[in-house]
Amino acid sequence: MRVPKKERQRLLQETIEHNPFIKDEELSKQFSVSIQTIRLDRMELKIPEVRERIKHVASEHLDEVKSLSMSEVIGDMIDLKLDDSAISVLDIEKEHVFSRNEIARGHVLFAQANSLAVALINDELALTTKADIRFSRQVHLGERVVAKARVMKLRGDGRTDVTVESYVGEECVFDGDFTIYRRGEEEQA
Amino acid sequence: MRVPKKERQRLLQETIEHNPFIKDEELSKQFSVSIQTIRLDRMELKIPEVRERIKHVASEHLDEVKSLSMSEVIGDMIDLKLDDSAISVLDIEKEHVFSRNEIARGHVLFAQANSLAVALINDELALTTKADIRFSRQVHLGERVVAKARVMKLRGDGRTDVTVESYVGEECVFDGDFTIYRRGEEEQA
DNA sequence: AAAGAACTTAATACCTGGTACTAATAGCAG
DNA sequence: CTGCTATTAGTACCAGGTATTAAGTTCTTT
């Protein structure tokens, strides 16, 4: 039943992660050590007491409502030549990924690319009307995505074709062809 | 400062509902009564102590995470038949629109549709690999968007084609064809 | 085998945010 | 004034800890 300290602490961490509601007493039974040992372990691993853990879970729940405000999922613009080309950078953080596997959600990459394409247009009103997009590689928590947009064709009728390619390092992770409508008040973005 | 009992209890209930983390002590200050009075009030109203309230909020949260992260869908899922069809509703609010003209940003509609398409897939891992989308009408602040997703083709190779159409009332405002990858750990969403 | 270090357990005082219960007081109506 | 409700006070007790000091118990290393 009894496992060495290192192993016990690894298991402890896992156990608590998967059930934050468990008390020291239960843990001590589960690992067949004294309560004090569990507490030392928690200290070393910097795991807070059960009430704090519960509070943490609960408070995450509360912000969930406002979490996906989406308003600024767009990254930082680092270069912009209107009606020509633009570059933005987005660091993938916790709120951008599926909690289960830490892979960035599709609409995050889309949002970065779309926002960039729209920003590129030198006009008061610019709205996306159409987009063909491909996700070519997963993007993980902590990675930095650089999106590069270029105007391909400025049509006379108010439509502009913009291509966006997003990279993590050398690798292309996303690309899309956007048609942006400018000026008029029809169409959609 | 001091309000009659009935009124105080009504406010107490509201206060706690909107902030379940509040302690008796704070409440007693807020209502300028003693802690004991607050406790009598809670008794009468059958409101549990703060730790229980927090635990309750937290456990709701856990359920959600386990129940295949409905929370990760944007908008409210109102119907879901796995691997068949799904419907979600999203009310367009301030954070979804361009402040200049109160038109919903493209990636908001995309996010609703994309999330719905991904949620539809009856698998642990589901990631968008490709999407062709069209925005056919502007969506304005305050409008309610209903997205309807339907699985079109379940290919053998792990790819599934999903079509999503989003409506405001009778009008189609967005539609898209998504290719979702399931299972494996390649590709991207 | 003895010494030391690392690990484990024990014991005790104290903390927060309560419950449960008893009793005293305040404020007002009849 | 009596009676009633509402409020406040006080005490004992609880869970689930923290923090600290001290005492074993192993394991290793010389």
UniProtKB/Swiss-Prot annotation, chains A, B:
GO terms for biological process: fatty acid biosynthetic process; negative regulation of DNA-templated transcription; negative regulation of fatty acid biosynthetic process. It comes from Exiguobacterium sp. (strain ATCC BAA-1283 / AT1b). Belongs to the FapR family. Keywords: DNA-binding, Fatty acid biosynthesis, Fatty acid metabolism, Lipid biosynthesis, Lipid metabolism, Repressor, Transcription, Transcription regulation. HAMAP family: Transcrip_fact_FapR. This is Transcription factor FapR. The keyword Zinc does not apply. Gene3D superfamilies: Hotdog Thioesterase, Winged helix-like DNA-binding domain superfamily/Winged helix DNA-binding domain. Transcriptional factor involved in regulation of membrane lipid biosynthesis by repressing genes involved in fatty acid and phospholipid metabolism. Signal peptide: none annotated. It comes from the Bacteria. Pfam families: 4HBT. The gene is fapR.
